[in-house]
Amino acid sequence: MNNKLTQHPDNAMLVEFSAGTLPTAASICVSAHLHFCQKCRAELLRLDQVGSQLMTEAEPADVDDSLFDSVMAKIEKAEAAPPENIDQKSDNGFPFSVNRLLNNPAHRPIWKRMSGSVDVARFKTGQTDYEVALHRICAGGKTPKHDHQGTEYTLSLIHI
């Protein structure tokens, strides 16, 4: 797999990723990028440390007593649920976040032909403003004519 990176997430995006507030679709792209980029992993670690320090120094907030019971109920419910059986040991060279999409038995990708050289699989994120779509493009293939409305993040994973 070719891992020459030409673009990187900006610091604002890495801060949101670190805080867990980045939308799912963008998080998948950032996670996949981090798989290949030592520079961005180092910056994320630094941001995580800053966030940790801020949390340590923050004044404790008053919380309703029922919140603890609610959190514990969610934890117990999650423990009772069977673990997802996702093949994490795939040796295809793809990042974990991409393998998680490709190998989830509950949501196997449905590939649809876009053109003679492009197939696409779309995934629901639960967010109406974002979409995750994986494209398989044959060597030498060209993407169909399309527009770029809104914000788009593209991560190209190239097998050579």
Regions from the PLM with identified roles:
Residues 1-41, 53-57:
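Short, amphipathic alpha-helical interaction patch
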Residues 44-52:
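Iron-sulfur (Fe-S) cluster-binding segments and ferredoxin-like electron-carrier domains
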Residues 51-73, 81-86:
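A short, acidic loop/turn at secondary-structure junctions
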Residues 79-127:
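A short, N-terminal "cap"/entry segment at the start of jelly-roll beta-barrel domains
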Residues 120-122, 132-136, 153:
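Conserved hydrophobic/aromatic beta-strand scaffold that supports enzyme active sites
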Residues 133-148:
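Conserved short histidine dyad/triad with adjacent acidic residue
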Residues 159-160:
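Conserved small/polar residues in nucleotide/adenosyl-binding loops
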